Structure formats: structure tokens, C-alpha cells
Amino acid sequence: MIDYKNTLNLPETGFPMRGDLAKREPDMLKNWYDKNLYQKVRESSKGKKSFILHDGPPYANGNIHIGHAVNKILKDIIMKSKTALGFDTPYVPGWDCHGLPIELKVEGIVGKPNEKISAAEFRQACRDYAKEQVEGQKADFIRMGILGDWDNPYLTMNFDTEAHIIRTLGKVIANGHLYKGSKPVHWCLDCGSSLAEAEVEYEDKVSPSIYVRFKAIDSAAVEAKFNAVGKGSGQISAVIWTTTPWTLPSNKAISINPEFDYQLVQFGDERVVLVKDLVESVQKAVGVESVEVLGEVKGDALELMQFQHPFYDYSVPLILGDHVTTDGGTGLVHTAPDHGQDDFVVSKKYNIEMAGLVANDGKFISSTPFFAGLGVFESNEKVLEKLKEVGALLKLERIKHSYPHCWRHKTPIIFRATPQWFIGMETQGLREQALGEIKSVRWIPSWGEARIDTMVANRPDWCISRQRTWGVPMTMFVHNETEELHPRTLEILESVAKRVEEKGIQAWWDLDPVEVLGEEDAKNYRKVPDTLDVWFDSGSTYASVVEARPEFNGNSTDMYLEGSDQHRGWFMSSLMLSTATNGKAPYKQVLTHGFVVDEKGRKMSKSLGNVIVPSEVWNKNGADILRLWVASTDYTGEIAVSHNILNSAGESYRRIRNTARFLLANLNGFDPKRDLVKPEEMIALDRWAVSCALEAQNDIKEAYDNYQFHTVVQRLMRFCSIEMGSFYLDIIKDRQYTTKADSLARRSCQTALWHIAEALVRWMAPILSFTADEIWSYLPQVEGRSEFVFTEEFYEGLFGLTEADKLDDAYWQQILKVRAESNRVLEQARKDKVIGSGLEAKVTLYANNEIRAMLEQLGNELRFVLITSQAIIKPLSEADVAEGEMAGLAVKVERAEGEKCPRCWHFATDIGTHTEHSSVCGRCVENVAGEGEKRSFA
């Protein structure tokens, strides 16, 4: 008996069914590194239009977390997809290396500077620590398949970068944006330094909530203002509300809104001044039963009326400020210019000076009556005692409210006026210019524009000075008496920058002023001891990196991509500095992603046990699963992750991998140079499959171009699961396995599979980089083929249907519907035990005239499309079964006639009629011993 198995074209490939990614990926990475893949990509893109994504530097401290993974994977997907779209995409990763978190870590290792160790040694220890942290994070980023110039990253502590940061400061000064002043800034008592806006977090804190009386200096004058002479009884007070009693010693005024209506109100046995809209709420809060309005005036009528400070021997004026609202409180705002931005601004208009009572360590200075030497938060209770003692405390409660905290120490911070260096938002029209530049940028998602616009419109001047050891120094000299900058400041800055370029920032601290100032000036000028805000470091990388590095060819940055918290962080600082120095935004597009949460929408927290560690994912599942999860998510909102979600990504991965494996296995023995069939000679279904791939590719390219990666994944899954997996790949198995190996029927099919595989691997590469690289190595080799898929552009060999194709896409879409209806009835027949597999079935399709005419075009090949042994078409009028879910079609399933062919598994009535091949059907005889069956459609 003949063994017909050897006459079949069974699929065969070395491409494994299981990804085993955790094991295979490191070997691929080694190959990428050994062969300098990043450089190969760069060389392949020479001369093409550039696309520059400037990497926002993560902080060089600690292990990477899942948010880092999301950020870097999104960037990598963009860079790889832009390469495939025909761009030159240099990617230089970077790190933020100066600043407080590193100082704190190093202090824990070597002690504080100038105590156990010199400042110079401390800086070197910080540099060494940061370098070590960079190496650890770098290894993790590389493990995720991120391509970039990892051997030459930018570090803000690189000597040349430090020098460029100093030069950016010079441009800020040259353009007139820098000034020195005493203004309230966020001040961390633990850091002993000012904080940037982006270094402030808001957490719940329990604070005293107090209503405080400021007695009228001249009650008769107040009565007169309210046209309430002789009305009511008892003392008159202006009532303020605050949650920071410690700021009352610094009170210098009470702010009111000129447009609001204020009332003099009988409050029990006393009279108080309140804004009209809040009288009822204050009455309720204080617990006063009887209230009577004695008079009412606009706020502007009360300007400069005097009230007594609660416990100090001076009076404070009522001053006008638009910052006063009726959202809460009393409509009269306690104003301490040392401790609030609005307080400072409004006091400045009235030439009210600051009190200067709080020192750098957060304690009241020795000359502060009642509270000398007390820490500000410690003094709260003492202030309350004093208020009670003098009868000024109207009401005390304790409330939990949102309060600013230091991002590093997690401790409450204060607003405190200190002499600092600022970039002025109004100086040289910087604010207006920046607001104009925001409009020229594409913000993705679009709400980002309104967000940063509001932030820029309302932000205070930028305090860029810090009182730290590990940071880029503000390499300036100021006059000992006038505090003015040296007249040759710009020249000096450049001279120092050159020294820093050679020896790093320590060159400044080692510098003898005589070397740059000469002996006479060195006597009259001193070094500024401050360092720059680290947001100045990273914010100036548009100059220190993009403008400075040769691979960017002087091109401007196309995109910044970071988490949504960077609107007030890196996006803001970069915009401010670039506008101040270059007169334009540093980016053309800004893309933001949300924060990672668990599947219930909760933040990652060790206490909740919901933390997903990236390394654990790639060690167990592989980095490609992590990458697929990131790409599958709509990153514009919160990004949910959990083990269940990652398992779901794993299921999607297996579907894509299985599709790729099917393609590769069925390309066994196919040589494109020898076996490729011309499009016009291909079988109709194969031509349609290639046209489906072209349509999918167009959708995928558009989605990549618009950074809609979840759409890419959805389209990829639809193509693999629906158009290919449940239709085309199912149908072609019979033709692929049973026809002659070199027949047109089979080579046409393999041609389609080859085109599809060449396209599919490129679609996958930006997301499933490791798997795409693996697939690429198993594809049939073509002369001149690149070694890596990452140097390739999207496949150009796909083609669409033409007018010459009688069976157009609309036709095949109808066939898909017919097949879906047939499958539904076949499945029911399986459940009813009428048949086992579809090949045991004979289907009769009762169709209306339109559907019948369509089906008849396939002739005898309809059964191959339906994957049944027999298919008969009859008029709908003859149906003895009901119409199904497709109007105009009724499907009847019966057991197929004849016997099962052991070679093709189809049932046939002619088995045994062929002398030499008596055990197989006539079709198989033709494919084994004859010229081979002819196919036209499927």
C-alpha cells in the first residue's frame, strides 16, 4: 500500500511554536550589540529626512520602575516605526545626574560635605554614585530592546554638558531675563533649600483651622464707611481665616477684593467685617446664633483702613487684591509677604516690606517676640495660645487638607522669602512669548495645550538658584556692596565654561577669582555660592545635547515624550529656557502618557501589593510581552497593569506568533527568486489576501504615524485573527498541502504568504522587536537582504485589486458573511452529532438570486471556501430549512456522500475507481500521478 504522506506538502519550519522569550531575548541582544545594530540602522538611514525625539532624562537614582518601562518603550516604538516610515532617527538616551536625591544617598554613605568629607570629595562621590546608577538603569533599558546610542549617552554631569548648561545661563543673562530678589519660594526645611514647582507634591495634612480677629483701630471710622454710625454694639474686628498660624507673626496686611460686597455684621455681642457671600458660612462655622447686617460697601471703599495686629504692637492696612475669592474663608485674607506668592505681589504694590522672621532652618530668628528659636510648625500651638490669651481667636478646629510636601523627604514645606536668582516671567515679555510658542506646538493628546498654557499663564518667576553642593554652579561674581553682577559676566561665564569642559564643575570651586577677574576686581567681587536648579540642567538639554551633538546635524527637535506630570516639569523648563535663549519652543510636538495604575485604577504601592516590577516581567514572560502590553494600551489616560492584564497580552502574543509560524512553515521550500508568481497570474483568493495585507498596512502606517499604537495592535490582531486566521489561512491549507509542490495553485498561495510575511514582520518590529528579529531570520532569503528587519522600511511589494479582478473586495466580504453563516450551521450540526469535522459535511446553500449568482462564480471551488467536502447551490424557493442570520440565505447540513480520502480527508464518491491508486479520491490521484488539479478562485 502506498504511503501518501510523502506526497503531501506538509508545513515545516525551525521557528519554534513557543516564544521562550525570557531565554532567547538575551542572546538576540548580544547579537545586536556584537553587530552594532544601532549603528547599522543609522547607516541605513543616511540622507533621509530626520526625526528627532529628544530623550527626557530619568533621574540617575534607584532601579527603574514600570513607569520608566512605559516611557522608554513608547519612545522606542516611535523611533523604530519612524525608521520604517523612511526617517533617519538618531536616539541619544540621557540621564539627570545632579541634585538633592543623589546628595542624600551619598550623605548616607560618606557623610555631609564639610563635616566628614570635603565638598570636592563629596562631589566626586556624587559623580561616582550617579555613574553607577546610570549603568544599572542602562542595562535594564537595553534589556527591554530599546535601540539607542547606549555607548555615548548624554549625562547632565558630563563635563561638556555642564559647560553647555553654564553657556545657557549666559544666554539667559545676555537676553535680560535674570534678576536677583527676595521672593517667597517653596522651601524644604529638611533640604535647607528652595524647591522647584515640579519638586512639590500635595499630600493630606492635619492643620489648625482658625478664624482670627483683627480689632479696628478707629471703630467710628469703620461705622462711617459702612454708613452704620450708632448701629450695633461691641468691638469691631476684621476676621481672617488661616490654616497656618505660624505665619501670623509675619502678617503685614489684610487683603480684600475691590469688586466684592463687604458687610459690617452684628455677630452676637461683637461686630465683624466679612464678605457678603460668606456671612452665612462663617456664622455656621463659628456657631453664632444671632446675626444682623448693619451696613454694606464695596471692597474698594475700605482700602487702607487700619486694624490692629492680634499680638504685635502695630496696625495693618486693608489692601486690594484680585486674588481674594469667595471659595472659602471670610473674604478677608491674612497677608504675609514672606510666605505667599499672592501676598508678596499685592504687598509690593503697597510698598509693604517683608518681616524676615524665619531663618534658613525654618526657625524664628532671635528677635521674634514670643516665638524666638521655635520651628515654624512647632510654633503653631504657641501662636494659638497667644491668640487665646489676647482674645483674638474666634474659632479653632482641626482639619485634614491638601498641603505641599517635599517630593523627596515627604515632609511639609513652607513658602519663605529668601534672596534668590530668578528668571523673570514678565522680563522682556517672556511669559507672552512662551504662551505664543505653545500655540505653535502639536500637543498629543490635545488637552495638553490648555494644561501647559494655564500653567505658564499663572506661574511665578522661576527661582533657578539652589543652596546645594552637587549641582552646576551659577558661575557668576557679584559686587560685595551693590550685589550687582560683574560687568564682564558673559565673558567670565565663557571662560569658566571652557575650564568646566576640561575638568568638570569642580573647576569653578577650585578657581581663584584673580585668574578671571584680576587682582583689583577680585577684592571687590565674590563668587555666587549657589548651584542651578536641576530643572535648569535638564531644561537646557535642547542646547547642550540636540544643538551640540553632531548626529542631530543642527536639526531642531521633533518630539518630547514624557509622563503628564512633565507639563510643569521638563516641558515647562525646556520651553522657558528655549524661549528665553532662542526665542522659540524647543519642540514641534509634545506627547504625554498617563501614570501606571493597577486594574482597579489604584496607584502602584508596596502596601497594596500591586507593584509590577519590569525585570520580573521580562525574566518570566519576556520583554516582548511588556512591549505588547504598553503598545496595546491607550497611553493618553491612566495605564492599567496587573498579572491578569499581562497574561492577556501573552494570549495576544501567541495569536500573532502562531500566525507568523504558519506563514513560515508554509514557505518551506519557497525561493522567491525562482518560485514567485506574478500578481496577474495568481489565484483570485491569494490576490485578495495580499490586497487585505495592503489595506492593513495602510491602516497600520497611519496609526504609527499618529502614535496610535493600540490601534496598530488592534489592526494587527484583526488581520491575524479574522482576515487570516479564521478565513484565508484556513481555506488554503487544502491547496497548500495537497496540490503538486510546484503547481501554480501552491506557488500562488506561497507567493501571497511570502508577501504577507514580509509585511507582517515589519509591522511587528517596532513593538515585538525580539520576535520580529527572530521571524526575520527564518524568512526565505533574498539577494541583497538586510541582516536586520530594523533597517527596513515598510514593505513595498504588496498590491491591491484592480478593475481586472472580477472578484473584488466587496465580493469577498460577502463570501465572508456566507462562510460565517455556513460555519454557524455546521457548528450546530457538530453539537447535534450529525457530523464531526466540516469535511464530513455536505452543505446545501439555498440562496436568493443575488447571492446565488455570487456563489456560482466559484463553481466547484465553493466547497474549498466553506471547508466542506461538498457544496450545492439551490434557489431559496426550494429551501426546506429556515433562513439564518444572513438575509436571503438558508443553509442545510447533511453528512457528506462517499468515503473519506486518507490523503486529503475530503469525502468523495470516486474512491476505489482508480486502479493504481484505489484508496484515494480522483482529485488526489490527479495531484499525485497526473498534471495536478487546476484552481482559479480558491
Curated annotation (Swiss-Prot):
A motif ('KMSKS' region) lies at residues 603-607. Binds 1 zinc ion per subunit. ATP binds at K606. It comes from the Bacteria. Its cofactor is Zn(2+). It is an enzyme of class 6 (ligase). A motif ('HIGH' region) lies at residues 58-68. The keyword Zinc applies. It is found in: Cytoplasm. Keywords: Aminoacyl-tRNA synthetase, ATP-binding, Cytoplasm, Ligase, Metal-binding, Nucleotide-binding, Protein biosynthesis, Zinc. It holds the Pfam family tRNA-synt_1. InterPro entries: aa-tRNA-synth_I_CS, aa-tRNA-synth_Ia, Anticodon_Ile_BEm, Ile-tRNA-ligase, Ile-tRNA-ligase_type1, Ile-tRNA_ligase, M/V/L/I-tRNA-synth_anticd-bd, Rossmann-like_a/b/a_fold. It catalyses: tRNA(Ile) + L-isoleucine + ATP = L-isoleucyl-tRNA(Ile) + AMP + diphosphate. GO terms for biological process: isoleucyl-tRNA aminoacylation. GO terms for cellular component: cytosol. GO terms for molecular function: aminoacyl-tRNA deacylase activity; ATP binding; isoleucine-tRNA ligase activity; tRNA binding; zinc ion binding. Zn(2+) binds at C901, C904, C921, C924. The keyword ATP-binding applies. IleRS has two distinct active sites: one for aminoacylation and one for editing. The misactivated valine is translocated from the active site to the editing site, which sterically excludes the correctly activated isoleucine. The single editing site contains two valyl binding pockets, one specific for each substrate (Val-AMP or Val-tRNA(Ile)). Belongs to the class-I aminoacyl-tRNA synthetase family. IleS type 1 subfamily. Monomer. HAMAP family: Ile_tRNA_synth_type1. NCBIfam families: ileS (TIGR00392). Catalyzes the attachment of isoleucine to tRNA(Ile). As IleRS can inadvertently accommodate and process structurally similar amino acids such as valine, to avoid such errors it has two additional distinct tRNA(Ile)-dependent editing activities. One activity is designated as 'pretransfer' editing and involves the hydrolysis of activated Val-AMP. The other activity is designated 'posttransfer' editing and involves deacylation of mischarged Val-tRNA(Ile). This is Isoleucine--tRNA ligase.
